[in-house]
Amino acid sequence: MIKPFTYDIAIIGGGISSCVFATTHFRNGFNGRIAIIENGRTLGGRSSTRNSHTNKGWQLNHGSPNFNICNSNKNKLLNNFIQELLDKDIIESDSSELIELYGDSINNSEINNNFYIGENYISKYSMSELSQNIISLNRFKNNIDYYFETLIVNLEFIKNRWILTSKNGDKFKSKFLVCSSNLLLHKRSLDI
C-alpha cells in the first residue's frame, strides 16, 4: 500500500471556486494543509486556457472565457473581493459588445437570461492564470499542495477521515472534503 498523503482539507477540482475557497479559509484564520486535486493539467477547471503547440503565444480561453457577478443582495464581502481582484490587475471589466455561440453573433443587449445578469469580467492574463492569481492573494500559498492529472476513483469515510484513492493508486487522507468539480455530475462519478 502507498503511504497516504495527509491533509486537513482535500479539495477535488482545481477551478475558480476551489481557489476562492482555499484563499478565503486562510484569510479567515485557517492555518492547516490543503490539497487541491485536479484531473486536468493545471488550475482553472472549466475556466481554462488552451495554448497552441504550433502558433507560439496563441491562446484560447474556453469553457468559460469570462464570468459575471450578480450581486443583487449587495454582499459586501463579494464586492470587496471583486474590488481587490480589480485593484491588483487580476481581472478587468469585459466590455465586449458581442458574444459568439456556434458561429452566431449575439448582441449583449439582446440577451435575456440570468446567466448574463450583472457585471461581466475577464482575466487580465488568461483564465488559467486567474485561479493561480487568486491563490497568490493569500500568504499561506505554501500550505497548498497541487496534484494535477489526478483522477479520484474512490472515496471512503473511515474513523473520521476521508480516504481518497486516485486512478494511479495514490491515497489522500483528510479531515474534511470539498467536492467542487462539476464532474460530480459525470457518469464516472456515480461509480464512486
Model-identified regions with their sequence ranges:
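Short hydrophobic core segments
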Residues: 9-12, 37, 152, 171-186
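Short beta-strand to alpha-helix junction loop
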Residues: 66-76, 107-137, 147
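Glycine-rich beta-alpha-beta "Rossmann" dinucleotide-binding loop(s) and their flanking helix/strand
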Residues: 187-192
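N-terminal glycine-rich dinucleotide-binding loop that anchors FAD/FMN and/or NAD(P) in oxidoreductases
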Residues: 51-79
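A conserved short coil-to-beta-strand element within the FAD-binding core of flavoproteins
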Residues: 148-163
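Beta1/beta-strand and adjacent pyrophosphate-binding region of the FAD-binding site
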Residues: 2-17, 35
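Conserved Rossmann-like nucleotide-cofactor binding loop
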Residues: 17, 42, 184
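Glycine-rich FAD pyrophosphate-binding loop
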Residues: 10-12, 23-54
